Amino acid sequence: MEIIAVTKTWPPNYITMTHELGLRSIGENRVKEAIQKFQSFKKMPNIKKRFIGHLQSNKVKKCVDAFDTIDSIHSLKTLKKVSRECDRAKKTIEILLQVNTSKEKQKKGFQPDNLKEIITCFEVPNVNIVGLMTMAPYTKDKKVIKTSFSLLRDVKEKANNMLGKNLIK
C-alpha cells in the first residue's frame, strides 16, 4: 500500500516537512501549480510526483514532462496522446486507468462493460499500466460505495483473464 499526500494548494515547505517525515508520494491535479512547486523538490529526488484528476489534452505534454505517474487516464485517445509525448520525452510513465464504475454522467472513465477498450490500452507503447482506479459515488450509503469498488475488482479480474496474465493490480 502506498500513501499519497494530495498537496494541491499546499505550499512547498509543507511538502518538504512531510518528506522529512517519510512521505514519498504526492498527488497534484493542477499541472501549472505543480510545475512551480516541483522546482523546490530538487533536493528530494526520491519523491514520486503523481498527477491525479482529469487530464486535459492541452496539458498532456507538460504533465508527461513534470510527473512520474498519471493516475487518471480516462480514455484511449488520451492514453495515445500521453504515449506520443512519452516517445518525444524518451520516457515511460506509470498509468492508472480510470473506470467509471458509478456510471455517473459527470464522471470520466472507461465504461466497466467495455473490456475490449481497456485491454487495447495494454498495446499502447511508452506507458506502463500498473492498475485501475475509480471514484466511488459521493454518498453515505456504504452499500453503493462497496458496489462501485466491487465492480472495479470484477473489471480487473475479467481483464486479467482476457490478457492471460495478472497485469492489472
What positions do the PLM features span?
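Conserved alpha/beta-domain cores
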Residues: 1-169
